Every structure is written in C-alpha cells, then in structure tokens.
C-alpha cells in the first residue's frame, strides 16, 4: 500500500509506504495500491528487473492519480540480446503517468520501457516528456501495451546525440 509520495535513493533509509519500497521489499507475489495521489519525484530510475510477480494498480489512487517524475520506469530481465526474452516478469502496471523530464537525465532516458522479458501488461499508461523515446519495449514475449498514450518527447533537450526525442 502506497501511503506517501516520497522516494529514496540507494544510500538512504528505505521509506515504508513508498512506491519504491512496495516494489523492492520482496520478490513474493504482491499487489500495490495507492492511498495517495500526486507526483512522485523519483530519486533514481525505477526498475522491475529483480522484482517480478507484481501488480501496480494505479487506478486506486484518489483524485488525479500518480505521476512519476525525474527518472525512467524500466522493465528488464536481461541486458544480453543473445538470451532473447529472459525470465517471466509476471507484472501488471496500470494507470500511471511517466514523465521523467530532463532535469536529471544524463543519457537518453525513455519515459517507460524495457527489454528481454516475458509476461507483462501495461494498461492506461501515459508516457511523455522524456529525453529519448517515450515508450520503448523490445526483445519481449507475451507483452501487451493497451490503452496507452505515447506523447511528446523532448526533441531539443540534453540527449548526448543532440536533437533526439523520437516519441
């Protein structure tokens, strides 16, 4: 259960009730629901790599829902393309806005993306305001992106290759 919009970094004390704590506290099957709404200012990227068997149910947030800001939201199980789709992520993520912006981006960050995993659904996700692509998934199996919006990326931002953002 998410009860705070706060986030923490690797060298900081974990904050119980935060979205990151709910994701990282266990590999056991779990469902994350929200008692709060607003903007979560991420202190680092949010990765599901090591934390499978997860449902994030964003529509439980009251009011205007949840926006993730400052960093990307990534689904990866392997960084080796020779492996192809890695293990089962077994994840469902619904009703979130992913808008990293460029304040902390030091390379081509996507708003939400992932590679080399199996078994995941994203639903009613809005992805935008990224330095690189907004919604990027490849090398995956049994993956569904439904009722999602891939909106504008930041073409003239701080991408290492110059004008870049390709939506």
Predicted regions: what they are:
Residues 1, 58-60:
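Short, conserved catalytic or adaptor-binding loops enriched in Gly and charged residues
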Residues 1-16:
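Right-handed parallel beta-helix/beta-solenoid
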Residues 6-8, 30, 37-39, 60-63:
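Acidic glycine-/aspartate-rich tracts in secreted/extracellular proteins
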Residues 15-28, 40-57, 64-94, 100-117, ...:
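Extracellular beta-strand-rich solenoid/capping regions of secreted or surface-exposed proteins
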Residues 35, 136:
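A cross-family glycoside hydrolase active-site/sugar-binding cleft signature
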Residues 53, 57-58, 86-100, 116-129, ...:
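Right-handed parallel beta-helix
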Residues 80, 109, 122, 132-134, ...:
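Conserved positions at the start
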């Amino acid at each position: 259960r998410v009860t705070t919009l706060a986030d923490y970094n690797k060298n900081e004390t974990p904050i119980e009730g935060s979205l990151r704590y709910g994701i990282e506290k266990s590999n056991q099957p779990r469902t994350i629901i929200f008692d709060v709404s607003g903007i979560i200012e991420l202190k680092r990227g949010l990765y599901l790599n090591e934390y499978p068997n997860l449902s994030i149910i964003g529509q439980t947030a009251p009011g205007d829902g949840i926006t993730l800001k400052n960093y990307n939201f990534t689904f990866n199980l392997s960084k080796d393309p020779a492996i192809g789709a890695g293990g089962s992520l077994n994840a469902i993520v619904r009703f979130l806005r992913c808008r990293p912006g460029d304040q902390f981006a030091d390379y081509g960050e996507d708003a939400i993306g992932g590679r080399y995993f199996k078994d995941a659904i994203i639903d009613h996700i809005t992805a935008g305001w990224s330095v690189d692509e907004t919604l990027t998934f490849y090398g995956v199996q049994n993956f569904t992106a439904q009722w999602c919006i891939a909106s504008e990326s930041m073409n003239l931002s701080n991408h290492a290759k110059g004008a870049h953002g390709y939506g």
